[in-house]
Amino acid sequence: MTVYLNGQFLPIGEAKISVLDRGFIYGDGVYELVPVYQREPYRLRQHLARLQRSLDGIRLANPHRYEQWEAIIRELIAHQPFDDQGVYFQVTRGAAKRDHAFPLDAVPTVFMMSNPLPVLTREQIEGGVPVVTAADERWLHCDLKTISLLGNVTY
């Protein structure tokens, strides 16, 4: 599988991210997933707008303009052997010394990969699929020492 990491397309086994990356240390980053049908990104402009809102929410400058994101995503799609796929990506604040304060000189890490989307049967398309809903209590568990410390570094 070919992935994208900081300006390079490379085999997934060659992709390396620093252990000091704030995404790893603090969960200091955002993600987005763009569905792709017949090699065409679905509602790309809306997904990139949501990415921008997420980046703004954690006060992280967007490392790319819309046209750059689109070009990277389209090239990643072209590297994959499947037509329907989900392009998943993360943008982190990058590698820096371990400190809750935002680093002034860190370069964001941009990682993207793509996986095939599941094929739905006609019955699933016409009749739907079962789902389960649950309350989202992730941020209510401040008593747990999880590695996502995003709440600590953004507020």
Where are these regions (language model features)?
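Conserved alpha/beta cores of soluble small-molecule-handling proteins
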Residues: M1-Y155
